[in-house]
C-alpha cells in the first residue's frame, strides 16, 4: 500500500526566483546514474557550491533551515527537461512537498508520480508565507490536502492542485506502475481473458 498524503507538516526553506528550471535543480552531469539513490546530495549543486566544492550562500546551505521538509518556490518552477531526476533529487534530499505559485506541467506530473505533492498558493498568500518563514525559520507549515489549505502561524490560505492529483495523493494511488505491480494476480486473470493467440507447449 502506498503512502496516503493527507496533512504534511514541517519547517520550510524559501527559495526565491521565477522559472527555476530542471538544469538548475539538478545539473545534467549528475543524471548519468543507473538509480536515483544519492541524487539528493546534488540538489542545486552549482548554486550551492563553487568549482572547488566550497559552500556558497544559498538557502539550502543556511543552518537556520536545516531539517526543512517543505520547499517554497515561486512561479514556473521545474521548467526545462522532462526527466524525472529533478523531482527525485528534491525528494531524496528529504523534502516531502513543494509550495509555489505555479509549476511546469511535466515536472508536476513527475513529482506527483513519486509522491511529492506540489501545491499552489495565490501570489499574495505565497508572499506572506515566504516572509513569515524568512522571519521565523522555525515556523511550522501544514499542507492539508483533504481540506485544501495551507496553515502557518495564525493564517490559513486556500491551496490549489489538480483534483486528479489530489485524489491520487490522498488515496495513496499516486504511483500507477506500483499499482500495476501490486495487482499481479488481477493482471494475470485479465491477461487470460484477452482474445489474442497464445503459444501452446
UniProtKB/Swiss-Prot annotation:
Highest taxon of the lineage: Bacteria
Coiled-coil segments: none
MF-aspect GO terms: 3-isopropylmalate dehydratase activity
Gene3D superfamilies per UniProt: Aconitase, domain 4 (3.20.19.10)
Record keywords: Amino-acid biosynthesis, Branched-chain amino acid biosynthesis, Leucine biosynthesis, Lyase
Pathway: Amino-acid biosynthesis; L-leucine biosynthesis; L-leucine from 3-methyl-2-oxobutanoate: step 2/4
Enzyme Commission number, as recorded: 4.2.1.33
Catalytic reaction annotation: (2R,3S)-3-isopropylmalate = (2S)-2-isopropylmalate
BP-aspect Gene Ontology terms: L-leucine biosynthetic process
Transmembrane segments: none
Alphabetical list of InterPro entries matching this protein: 3-IsopropMal_deHydase_ssu, Aconitase/3IPM_dehydase_swvl, AconitaseA/IPMdHydase_ssu_swvl, IPMI_Swivel, LeuD
Pfam families in the cross-refs: Aconitase_C
GO cellular component, one term: 3-isopropylmalate dehydratase complex
EC top class, as a word: lyase
HAMAP family: LeuD_type1
Quaternary structure and partners: Heterodimer of LeuC and LeuD.
PANTHER family found in the cross-reference section: 3-ISOPROPYLMALATE DEHYDRATASE SMALL SUBUNIT, 3-ISOPROPYLMALATE DEHYDRATASE SMALL SUBUNIT 2-RELATED-RELATED
Biological role stated in the UniProt entry: Catalyzes the isomerization between 2-isopropylmalate and 3-isopropylmalate, via the formation of 2-isopropylmaleate.
Family to which the UniProt record says this protein belongs: Belongs to the LeuD family. LeuD type 1 subfamily.
Protein name as it appears in the record: 3-isopropylmalate dehydratase small subunit
